[in-house]
A protein has these predicted regions:
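Outer-membrane beta-barrel "beta-signal"
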Residues: 54, 424, 450-464
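Extracellular loop and loop/strand-boundary signature of outer-membrane beta-barrel proteins
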Residues: 121-123, 153-155, 218-221, 255-258, ...
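Detector for outer-membrane/organellar transmembrane beta-barrel domains
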Residues: 280-414, 418, 430
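Short sequence motifs at beta-strands and strand-loop junctions characteristic
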Residues: 99, 126-130, 160-162, 222-227, ...
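The canonical Cys-X-X-Cys-His
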Residues: 52-63
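Transmembrane beta-barrel architecture of outer-membrane proteins
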Residues: 129-133, 163-167, 228-230, 265-269, ...
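Outer membrane beta-barrel
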Residues: 66-67, 100-116, 121-255, 264-280, ...
Length: 464
């Protein structure tokens, strides 16, 4: 389960990064259905269109989306985006429900090796997870206007199944003053999971990461903290293939006992983006944000208020048979910590947090991808909120906490990925920390340096 700035033990844990490949899995699920029922493919015009597309129609290399992949997602994982090209079979005039004809089930398997530059106290280095994740997906078109992407994941880290990223959509098209308006409704469980770009947190690079390596303590709320902890319903529109807008309202799941950091009432999320082609160059520029009041403990009394405001951009350019993309994300978070400071868990009543991510990806012949990125999280110094961890005599020293009460962390990531087939990915990623929880050296007063958390992560990722 994800946690966010719950300071009962004086530590903070960044949520494990979920992996994702929504349209590839819809594609592979449909392809499996086609192979199993090839003789009836022509009787299923909408699914025949889905299964007739190569995975490269939706993805540069999975899980990155092409322009068609973005349109397919905004059209609710249905074939509305290509309906004009579909010739309906005369025998297929029943009401538009296709879930009884095919069962769009897919499987994702990941196994990984993680090695840090310095072993974590009390553990062996070079940990292997088999599996790291095992996911089942129900992903595809239910009716001509309704589609689903539902992921249930088994985590090797905690040995349990949970409902992972889920997005159920209704979508349709209309015309306003001769301009196309795509509109829809989304029901999902993770702010930004509904977004079609890779410059927002849910689908940003890295697409998979180590869940057994140390990560910085501080994370913005919109940056995956509420993932799978909330349910939201919202509406979106895409006007003239340029302007995208989305408003979704989230509410915490009713769990007994309640989770720490439960949302009081509802938490509104908003998104606005503009996309434009300049010759062969593509550019998206946007903004998104989230406001939430959270109970840090019991569901009563004062709350903490979080305001997240973010800006993002995505750039793409084909280079012959190759492809280049780049992403930039900036998130500002304002924190009014009335409840936390009142309970003595924060030195300040008001803190801020700034997050920046910049990455570039080069795809060679859809078989090899090179990734490089820079990341930074800087914020207010708060000796109680980010302070040094408690050290228990006779126990290994923790790797969390900050000796100077600073959340500042920054560094670089590099990755190489090889795709021998469209549904198989082998990759190796290396993370370098130049600063971790406020310092480069002895960051939590236990003698551990930021460089000790540098991480090699080797992954095998299979989809079927």
């Amino acid at each position: 389960m994800n946690r966010f700035r719950f300071r009962a033990s004086g530590t903070t844990t960044r949520p494990a990064r979920r992996t994702h490949a929504p349209l590839l899995l819809a594609c592979t699920a449909s392809a499996a259905a086609l192979l199993l029922d090839a003789g009836n493919a022509n009787a299923l015009p909408s699914f025949a269109r889905q299964t007739g597309l190569a995975c490269s129609a939706c993805h540069t290399t999975f899980p990155e989306l092409t322009p068609f992949g973005r349109a397919f997602k905004m059209h609710g994982y249905t074939t509305l985006s290509v309906n004009d090209a579909i010739n309906e079979n005369e025998s297929d005039k029943a009401p538009g429900v296709t879930i009884n004809r095919t069962f769009p089930l897919s499987v994702m398997f990941q196994t990984s090796l993680t090695r840090t530059n310095q072993a974590q106290p009390g553990t062996q280095n070079s940990s292997v997870e088999f599996p790291q994740q095992l996911s089942l997906f129900l992903a595809g078109e239910i009716t001509p206007h309704i589609g689903i992407f539902l992921q249930a994941t088994y985590s090797g880290q905690d040995g349990s199944f949970t409902l992972d990223n889920t997005d159920i959509r209704y979508a349709n098209d209309t015309q306003i003053d001769g301009k196309e308006l795509l509109y829809g409704v989304t029901l999902n469980n993770n702010p930004t999971v509904e977004d079609p770009w890779h410059s927002t947190p849910a689908w940003s690079w890295p697409f998979a990461s180590a869940d057994s390596a140390p990560t910085p303590d501080a994370t913005a709320l919109v940056d995956g903290v509420l993932a799978q902890q909330v349910a939201g319903i919202g509406g979106y529109g895409f006007w003239n293939k340029h302007l995208y807008a989305d408003v979704t309202i989230y509410r915490s799941a009713q769990i007994n006992p309640p989770e720490p950091m439960t949302v009081r009432g509802v938490a509104p999320y908003w998104r606005l983006a503009w996309q434009q082609n300049f010759g062969i160059n593509y550019l998206e520029v946007g903004t998104f944000g989230l406001f939430a009041e959270l109970y840090p403990g019991p569901l009563s009394g004062p709350t903490d208020k979080y305001t997240d405001l973010a800006f993002d951009t995505q750039y793409e350019r084909p280079l012959g048979a190759d492809f280049l993309s780049a992403h930039l994300t900036y998130i500002w978070q304002g924190e009014q910590l009335t409840a936390t400071s009142g309970s003595g868990a924060s030195s300040n009543r008001y803190d801020t947090l700034n997050t920046v991510r910049l990455d570039a990806i080069y795809h060679w012949r859809s078989q090899l991808a090179l990734y490089g990125g820079w990341f930074l999280t800087h914020g207010s110094t708060d000796a109680l909120l980010y302070g040094p961890p408690a050290v228990t005599p006779g126990q290994p020293p923790p790797v969390t906490g900050s000796a100077n009460g600073s959340p500042n962390s920054d560094g670089l990531k590099f990755e190489i990925a090889y795709y021998p087939w469209q549904n198989v990915r082998f990759s190796a990623m290396y993370t370098v920390y130049t600063q971790f929880n406020g310092r480069a050296n002895n960051y939590n007063d236990t003698g551990r340096n930021a460089s000790g958390n540098d991480t090699l992560y080797v992954l095998a990722w299979l989809n079927y």
